[in-house]
């Protein structure tokens, strides 16, 4: 029996995945977590074989949660299940040790295949993600994203700013003081060589970190 832990900050997504996997022979969802912190706690208690990990979550995001999880429990297999198809997310998560990467648009059959494949010691990457990574490997490296210089927390805050969240809103969601959020904000500006939230939003759109419509 393959024990699975589902990690996503949206209740409907967690519940939907759990229900879909309930009738699959050989799989058992042993728990659900809505943030990285709970994922790490439940993983210690439940000892799952496979963790289905979202990327963008309040508090500890999927990237940092994957790093910490595999540092303490290296035998666990992490499959990233997310809407984040554009680099640097796939590259960063795979470098952090994720065994699989798939989009939330995938069907049940693909998800089951991914779980069984990583449990067997192989990797699984959705076809569209694999094609994107393959194409990138042939591109000149000088076009790497400036966001590659940011930490996981800095990327999390940068994306929230780019999506028009104010300092107080970010402070409330991440349980940080406004002063700490502003410290991160100016550090992000310095690393990206920008001076305003508008420039950050434009840079994020240009490098595929957020949709232009948002």
Swiss-Prot record:
UniProt modified residues of type 4-aspartylphosphate: 54
Listed name of the protein: Response regulator GacA
Function recorded in the entry: Positively controls the production of the autoinducer N-butyryl-homoserine lactone and the formation of the virulence factors pyocyanine, cyanide, and lipase.
Feature: DNA-binding region: 167-186
Origin superkingdom: Bacteria
UniProt domain HTH luxR-type: residue ranges: 143-208
Alphabetized GO MF terms: DNA binding
Signal peptide boundaries: none
Domain annotation Response regulatory: ranges: 3-119
Biological process per Gene Ontology, one example term: positive regulation of single-species biofilm formation on inanimate substrate
Organism: Pseudomonas aeruginosa (strain ATCC 15692 / DSM 22644 / CIP 104116 / JCM 14847 / LMG 12228 / 1C / PRS 101 / PAO1)
Keywords from the UniProt entry: Activator, Autoinducer synthesis, DNA-binding, Phosphoprotein, Transcription, Transcription regulation, Two-component regulatory system, Virulence
């Amino acid at each position: 029996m393959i024990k699975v832990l589902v990690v996503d900050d949206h209740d409907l997504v967690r519940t939907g995945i759990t229900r879909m996997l309930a009738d699959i022979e050989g799989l058992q969802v042993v728990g659900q977590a809505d943030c990285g912190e709970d994922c790490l706690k439940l993983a210690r208690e439940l000892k799952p074989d496979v963790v289905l990990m979202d990327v963008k979550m309040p508090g500890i995001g999927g990237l940092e949660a994957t790093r910490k999880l595999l540092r303490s429990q290296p035998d666990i297999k992490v499959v990233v299940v997310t809407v984040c198809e554009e680099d640097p997310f796939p590259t960063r998560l795979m470098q952090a040790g994720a065994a699989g990467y798939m989009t939330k648009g995938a069907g049940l059959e693909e998800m089951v295949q991914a779980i069984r494949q990583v449990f067997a010691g192989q990797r699984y990457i959705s076809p569209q993600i694999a094609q994107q990574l393959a194409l990138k490997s042939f591109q000149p490296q000088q076009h790497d994203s400036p966001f590659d210089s940011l930490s996981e927390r800095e990327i999390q805050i940068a994306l929230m700013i780019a999506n028009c969240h104010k300092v107080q809103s970010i402070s409330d969601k991440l349980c940080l003081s406004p002063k700490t959020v502003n410290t991160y904000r100016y550090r992000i500006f310095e690393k990206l060589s920008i001076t305003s939230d508008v420039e950050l939003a434009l840079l994020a759109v240009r490098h595929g970190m957020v949709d232009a419509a948002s």
